[in-house]
Amino acid sequence: MKRSASDSPLLFDLPLAPDFSQEQQLMKRGLKHIAGIDEAGRGPLAGPVVAAAVVLDQNDLPEGLDDSKRLTAARREALYEIILTKAITVSVASLSARSIDASDIRKAALEAMRRAVIGLTLKPCHALVDGRDVPPGLSCPGSALVKGDQRSVSIAAASIVAKVTRDRMMIRAGAAHPPYGLEIHAGYATQKHRAAIESEGPVPGLHRYTFAPIKGRFDC
């Protein structure tokens, strides 16, 4: 597994908000189009893992971009629409709960990231990836940035797109499976969700059977 050789996990100088400095450093080397990559949905008991890749226009950066976890749902929704309008290209890919169970969540998240880059309408010169790992088989050179969604606006944009996309998917799943309250917690292990799993059982294709407390207790 490739890891960024230059990025340190010990970050004492995180900016108050992500900026374009990481991208500018790469552009000074003649790399024109820089993609930000992030994912949403590593931890839930249900639903897919969703990854997004975003190439922003350096001359028309959306204002207010930040790590999706530091934004309200309403603000994420608003920024999502702005990103889709202003970005040069945006792509989303997801892997299902069954795919996650067939490998593991880390591999599934990295594979979703790889597929998201493939879906871009232009091939980026370089990718900035949130986390510690560059996805295997990435179609362009990449760098892993620990807490990248708080450092790079491109990664922050990808985090917003991935989060909003996944939340919308879980709202639809909630409508199809009312007892679980998926539209409220997006599949995370809330008390209500765990209680529903105990009373109703997990849903094949929706729940992750390799995740506790489901693992080993229910047949898929």
Swiss-Prot record:
Residues 32-220 form the RNase H type-2 domain. GO terms for molecular function: manganese ion binding; RNA binding; RNA-DNA hybrid ribonuclease activity. The keyword Ion transport does not apply. Transmembrane segments: none annotated. It catalyses: Endonucleolytic cleavage to 5'-phosphomonoester. It is found in: Cytoplasm. Its EC number is 3.1.26.4. One of its GO terms (cellular component) is ribonuclease H2 complex. GO terms for biological process: DNA replication, removal of RNA primer; mismatch repair. Gene3D superfamilies: Ribonuclease H-like superfamily/Ribonuclease H. It is an enzyme of class 3 (hydrolase). Keywords: Cytoplasm, Endonuclease, Hydrolase, Manganese, Metal-binding, Nuclease. Manganese or magnesium. Binds 1 divalent metal ion per monomer in the absence of substrate. May bind a second metal ion after substrate binding. Signal peptide: none annotated. Its cofactor is Mn(2+); Mg(2+). A divalent metal cation binds at residues 38-39, 130. PROSITE patterns: RNASE_H_2. PANTHER family: RIBONUCLEASE H2 SUBUNIT A, RIBONUCLEASE HII. Endonuclease that specifically degrades the RNA of RNA-DNA hybrids. Belongs to the RNase HII family. This is Ribonuclease HII. It comes from Brucella ovis (strain ATCC 25840 / 63/290 / NCTC 10512).
